[in-house]
């Protein structure tokens, strides 16, 4: 697993090993490796520091929990935002992160929002963690247009307002925490109380 890339984005490596695999490929005679995130049709989203693409077919990813069917689904634009969410939950509540309390859908592109509408129909509560831009708002409005009358649709992007996306929010949170710990470490060794990341 290309941990150097995950460290830059402050993604939890163990969570990523569970959710992703490693892809190795050759391009122009050079060998590369990347993170590969599976989708619902057997394809993969592929990412490394220099490359962002997919192994066809392009499709959404639908992560369903085992056991009793969940009535809540969290929806993300890309898998880096999904991994950022898991990391934030794990960091703030390491003993009870509640990662399996809901299902997840990763669009793998806002252009795939239509493909997500049918599976979203089985959920009572939908939380959308889209980018804070026009495309993200359009995707949210499309889901609200389809299900807004009889389902709870939440715009969770308000949590990271001022950031482009959830991954940027994660990076800023961890950088801020490290700066505070560094400053406090000079004066005190007392542990910092966690505020938590509840969604």
What is each PLM-predicted segment?
Residues 70-72, 124-125:
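Short coil/turn segments at beta-strand junctions that form active-site/ligand-binding loops
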Residues 89-199:
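TOPRIM fold recognition
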Residues 31-32, 68-70, 100:
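Short, well-ordered loop/turn elements at secondary-structure boundaries
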Residues 1-60, 64-65:
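Basic, glycine-enriched DNA-binding surface that flanks or lies within the catalytic cores of DNA
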Residues 80-81, 139:
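Acidic, divalent-metal-coordinating active-site segment for phosphoryl/phosphodiester hydrolysis
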Residues 74-77:
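Short hydrophobic beta-strand that contains or immediately precedes a catalytic carboxylate
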């Amino acid at each position: 697993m290309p941990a150097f890339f995950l460290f830059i984005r402050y993604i939890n490596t163990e969570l990523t090993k569970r959710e992703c695999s490693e892809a190795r490929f050759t391009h122009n005679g050079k060998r590369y490796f990347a993170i590969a995130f599976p989708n619902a049709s057997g394809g993969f989203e592929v990412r490394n520091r220099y490359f962002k693409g997919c192994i066809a077919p392009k499709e959404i990813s639908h992560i369903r929990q085992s056991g009793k069917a969940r009535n809540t689904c969290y929806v993300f634009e890309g898998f880096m935002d999904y991994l950022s969410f898991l990391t934030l939950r794990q960091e703030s509540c390491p003993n009870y992160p509640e990662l399996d309390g809901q299902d997840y859908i990763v669009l793998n592109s806002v252009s795939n929002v239509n493909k997500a509408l049918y599976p979203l129909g089985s959920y009572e509560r939908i939380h959308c963690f889209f980018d804070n831009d026009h495309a993200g708002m359009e995707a949210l409005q499309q889901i609200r247009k389809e299900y807004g009358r009889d389902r709870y649709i939440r715009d969770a992007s308000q949590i990271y307002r001022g950031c482009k996306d959830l991954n940027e929010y994660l990076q800023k949170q961890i950088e801020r925490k490290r700066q505070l710990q560094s400053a406090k470490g000079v004066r005190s060794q007392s542990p910092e109380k966690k505020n938590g990341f509840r969604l």
